[in-house]
A protein has these predicted regions:
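Extended beta-strand/beta-hairpin segments
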Residues: 1-63, 75-164
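Metal-dependent nuclease catalytic cores in nucleic-acid-processing enzymes
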Residues: 72
Length: 164
């Protein structure tokens, strides 16, 4: 059985990438994020120089992982007709010294650590809970974060009216 999730309900075929556009000014940290019909704001907390008008970029990254994990687990349980009533994912991001991570390949410098704690609600057997924990690690965002990622950054320069 395929472990992939997709939905065509938003007019985008499953697996079709949708462009995310982020608008920001050279002043402050507040960013407007546009994803199809959705509008979000990202910012930094006041103690980091931001206006605290929205979640931080790391908050959004954790939200993406948590939402994907919850959706993946719920979909799997529905397909199996298991009595899962709800999923709560709590996530934290930190940076640790590589030497403090015995299971990590990197042994120098610092590494990013994401702690993901999942709570399953429902009358699930121990075997079902263990299987759902295994499935949680197969969500597409989890796989992306733990795989090799090729980010291709390009730039465009636009002169605005009144610019020199």
């Amino acid at each position: 059985m395929s472990e992939q999730i997709g939905s065509a309900s938003n007019g985008v075929m499953a697996g079709t990438p949708r462009e995310v556009v982020v608008y920001g000014s050279a002043e402050g940290f507040t960013q407007e994020i546009v994803i199809g019909p959705h509008r979000l704001v990202a910012d930094e907390p006041a103690d980091m120089g931001g206006a605290d008008e929205g979640p931080t970029p790391y908050d959004l990254l954790l939200a993406a992982l948590g939402a994907c994990t919850s959706m993946t687990v719920a979909l799997y349980a529905r397909r199996k007709s298991w009595p899962l009533q709800g999923v709560t994912a709590r996530l934290r991001h930190s940076r640790i010294h590589a030497v403090d991570c015995a299971e990590c390949e990197t042994k120098e410098g610092r590494i990013d650590r994401i702690e993901l704690n999942i709570e399953f609600a429902g009358q699930l057997s121990k075997e079902q809970q263990l299987k759902l924990l295994e499935i949680a690690k197969k969500c597409p965002v989890h796989r992306t974060l733990t795989s090799e990622v090729d980010i291709r950054t390009r730039a465009e320069w636009k002169m605005h009216a009144g610019s020199a």
